[in-house]
Amino acid sequence: MVAKAKTTKAKVELPPFEYPQGYQLIAGVDEVGRGPLVGDVVTAAVILDPNNPIEGLNDSKKLSEKKRLALLPEIKEKALAWAVGRCSPEEIDELNILQATMVAMQRAITGLKVQPDLALIDGNRCPELPMDSQAVVKGDLRVAEISAASIIAKVVRDQEMEELDKQYPQFGFAKHKGYPTKAHFEAIEQHGVISEHRKSFKPVKKALGLD
């Protein structure tokens, strides 16, 4: 009997990001909360100080909650500017989640106390902005400014889900953060839909008998 060789998935190496030349103030922008059935989509914009680096920045999803919470005050203290933008469930239902995310990113950039020369956006598309912008695929892993933005947005949204959990403990929002899990589906089936649910999302529409 011939033993089969184990196949391991090759790790895809991301190319290092080359920052465009000629820009003084660069903002990184990221979002959290496109997939959940409940709550705001939250974005953050961050301009880091190149003379005051922050160790350990990475995509917020790759960091433990403890590490994110430890990095948050350091990011806020050392950044030249940071701001949070959001769109509510009502706006998401009106615009659709993609457009609402773009609007939330615009709000985060507008909220910066210093306006950047360039905005680096995580993903493959940019919102309309008054300054130059560039989409960076996997930017939360490749660009420190985007990593910092992802950490702020993630912590802010998670904390909002924990607050919502206090109002509606039967839904378990602190655990699944509003994402479409089995426990969330069962809670909707048992307790119905709350005002913070996104009514345009298929499982919620179905629960409301609109699908």
UniProtKB/Swiss-Prot annotation:
GO terms for biological process: DNA replication, removal of RNA primer; mismatch repair. It holds the Pfam family RNase_HII. GO terms for cellular component: cytoplasm; ribonuclease H2 complex. The keyword ATP-binding does not apply. Keywords: Cytoplasm, Endonuclease, Hydrolase, Manganese, Metal-binding, Nuclease. One of its GO terms (molecular function) is RNA-DNA hybrid ribonuclease activity. Its EC number is 3.1.26.4. A divalent metal cation binds at D30, E31, D122. NCBIfam families: PRK00015.1-1, PRK00015.1-3, PRK00015.1-4. Endonuclease that specifically degrades the RNA of RNA-DNA hybrids. This is Ribonuclease HII. The lineage of its organism: Bacteria, Pseudomonadati, Pseudomonadota, Gammaproteobacteria, Vibrionales. The gene is rnhB.
